[in-house]
Amino acid sequence: MFEHDFLALFPEIFLINATIILLIYGVVFSTSKKYDYPPLVRNVGWLGLLSVLITILLVAVGSPLAVANLVYNNLIIDNFTYFCQIFLLLSTASTMVMCLDYFKQESLNAFESIVLILLSTCSMLFMISAYDLIAMYLAIELQSLCFYVIAASKRDSEFSTEAGLKYFILGAFSSGILLFGCSMIYGFTGVTNFEELAKIFTGYEITLFGAQSSGIFMGILFIAVGFLFKITAVPFHMWAPDVYEGSPTIVTAFFSIAPKISILANMLRVFIYSFYDPTWQQLFFFCSIASMILGALAAMAQNKVKRLLAYSSIGHVGYLLIGFSCGTIEGIQSLLIGIFIYVLMTVNVFAIVLALRQNRFKYIADLGALAKTNPILAITLSITMFSYAGIPPLAGFCSKFYLFFAALGCGAYLLALIGVVTSVISCFYYIRFVKIMYFDTPKTWVLYKPMDREKSLLLAITVFFITFFFLYPSPLFLVTHQMALCLCL
Amino acid sequence: MILFYVFVVLALVSGAMVIRAKNPVHSVLFLILVFCNTSGLLVLLGLDFFAMIFLVVYVGAIAVLFLFVVMMLHIRIEEIHENVLRYLPVGGIIGLIFLLEIFLMVDNDYIPILPTKLSATYLTYTVYAGKIHSWTNLETLGNLLYTTYFFLFLVSSLILLVALIGAIVLTMHKTTKVKRQDVFIQNAIDFQNTIKKVR
């Protein structure tokens, strides 16, 4: 028990310990009179980034255990969790790179938010490798608790406080629904472990009106609703635009990047591995169509950048759910490719949003004539927007192509059709960015401050990837194929 | 058996007093009495851990919270003179429905063990009485929580840590404008000079 489990969990243990040490460091030194109450944000930020990078290294080097059930079947590690964790840690690291400069400019001296980001990263690692309903619920709860706090972390802004409160109340509801679903499943089957659930559900047809227990059906329904709430799929998306708009921009970036990976990974584990059944497929089918349509239509009316990005992320969740509702290996693979590319594009967009600041980059119209004032940034943003829209050689096209292909492969023609139509519609508002940057002359010309070097590196890497992904996509395909096989076999 | 009746009668009486008491503070105190008696009943049932948790959670946290809320709200006692009978029909119906549901639930088998029908002739008796190895609730819980489920225990401790950090982050202001209580100065104040009568 001890030698294997602690060896395999070493990255998580390291991250928790580093976080707690950082917390103590911050508490002790930021209140010390001797050093004149130093603002430790940048310091703690760099140290936090360093510990995330070391954790990536620890995960990537890997323990000698490739596949194992850990801590009495509460966690699992295999190829799927391995790649998901590395990817999650990379995206967290990129968020932290963005936040280094942000806190200084906003003069927001809260090193606690970095500690909370680290803690939530840790919970997301647990969420990816959760193998038991209780472990899953606890990880989700830890993550959302951190999120409520960092959403409200800018206390002197009313928007941020509102976002935190709204997120807290709605998130508490969704957690309650999720927990209710878990307890229904436990009540009607008597097990909480995913593997045992998978054994029970093989060949067990869950029908609402049939002879079998409707309690299990309701349990799965509730769990699905809880999850859809967390990833902002459409009937349960109400909180997303307000929360995304209200929270500080760096927190918005974190919200729209990291939890998408972990929650989708956990959903795949729960629904594809444990409850493999056609009954939930209809639900995801419906949510996917609704999110694509709403993401395309509602984003057109927005003129604030963060709100628009929130709706665009809702639309992308719809596209990802296409892969989910297929339920085939190709579907899962295309979902994983899709989330990878989505995260890269989102990192890029938020780095630009954070880089453009005179006072604050809030409305889309503020972008006017960026092509004159900062041509390189304008080209970067327009490449990303074309990629979001799915214009052929770029990475965004590849992800959408494989998602629609998977939908066609399993006979869900309606999904593919609506996907194509909505992505054409959504081209309108993505390309509007380009139009404003290149062809509009603003009333007042604004000059933006130069961005810091970390962000420029991040932008360069992501743009390079987005542009040249089509030349050599096979590593990603191999990796995602292996991950999908890991879940299905 | 006498103890059981004592607890039941006290719980019921103080439960009624929660509703009847004019002073909200008194009714919260009666609520605490109800909780104490119920935990006594739980001990009699052999649920020692539940009794403990009941006291800790309900009396220690929730009832004290209620007391604070009641004291802060500053309700005048004279203002509360409503007709109790007004709420009787609705409350009575809800109570009756609740009672009916409980009678429906008692002695019901929720989960049939197997969907197929087994004939009873196959079954033989096992004398389970000889196999019982008796542990109390506390021992069982401790054994499970610190061995099999230690991971969950640690994760919940992290959740509590986050709650702690969150409460501090969201409420503590570090600027100089905030009025803060200095304990030493507060204790050193001369009570004679703080309040003066102005003629």
Curated annotation (Swiss-Prot), chain A:
Record keywords: Electron transport, Membrane, Mitochondrion, Mitochondrion inner membrane, NAD, Respiratory chain, Translocase, Transmembrane, Transmembrane helix, Transport, Ubiquinone
Enzyme Commission designation: 7.1.1.2
Protein name per UniProt: NADH-ubiquinone oxidoreductase chain 2
Membrane topology listed for this record: Multi-pass membrane protein
Family of the protein in this entry: Belongs to the complex I subunit 2 family.
Function: Core subunit of the mitochondrial membrane respiratory chain NADH dehydrogenase (Complex I) that is believed to belong to the minimal assembly required for catalysis. Complex I functions in the transfer of electrons from NADH to the respiratory chain. The immediate electron acceptor for the enzyme is believed to be ubiquinone.
Top-level EC class as recorded in UniProt: translocase
Residues annotated as transmembrane: 9-29, 47-67, 80-100, 114-134, 168-188, 216-236, 248-268, 280-300, 309-329, 335-355, 376-396, 401-421, 459-479
Disulfide bonds: none
A single cellular component GO annotation: mitochondrial inner membrane
InterPro entries registered for this protein in UniProt: NADH-Q_OxRdtase_suN/2 (IPR010096), ND/Mrp_TM (IPR001750)
Reactions catalysed according to its record: a ubiquinone + NADH + 5 H(+)(in) = a ubiquinol + NAD(+) + 4 H(+)(out)
Transmembrane helix as UniProt keyword: yes
Cellular localization per UniProt: Mitochondrion inner membrane
UniProt keyword Transport present: yes
GO biological process, one term: ATP synthesis coupled electron transport
Name of a matching Pfam family: Proton_antipo_M
Gene Ontology MF terms in the entry: NADH dehydrogenase (ubiquinone) activity
Domain of life of the native organism: Eukaryota
Swiss-Prot record, chain B:
Transmembrane segments: 1-21, 27-47, 49-69, 87-107, 150-170
Broad class of where this protein is predominantly found: mitochondrion
GO CC terms of this entry: mitochondrial membrane
Leading EC class: translocase
InterPro entries: NADH_UbQ/plastoQ_OxRdtase_su6, Nuo/plastoQ_OxRdtase_6_NuoJ
Known catalytic reactions: a ubiquinone + NADH + 5 H(+)(in) = a ubiquinol + NAD(+) + 4 H(+)(out)
Localization terms from the record: Mitochondrion membrane
Gene Ontology molecular function terms on file: NADH dehydrogenase (ubiquinone) activity
Protein role: Core subunit of the mitochondrial membrane respiratory chain NADH dehydrogenase (Complex I) that is believed to belong to the minimal assembly required for catalysis. Complex I functions in the transfer of electrons from NADH to the respiratory chain. The immediate electron acceptor for the enzyme is believed to be ubiquinone.
Family: Belongs to the complex I subunit 6 family.
NCBIfam families per record: PRK06638.1-4
Protein name: NADH-ubiquinone oxidoreductase chain 6
Species the sequence originates in: Marchantia polymorpha
This protein's encoding gene: ND6
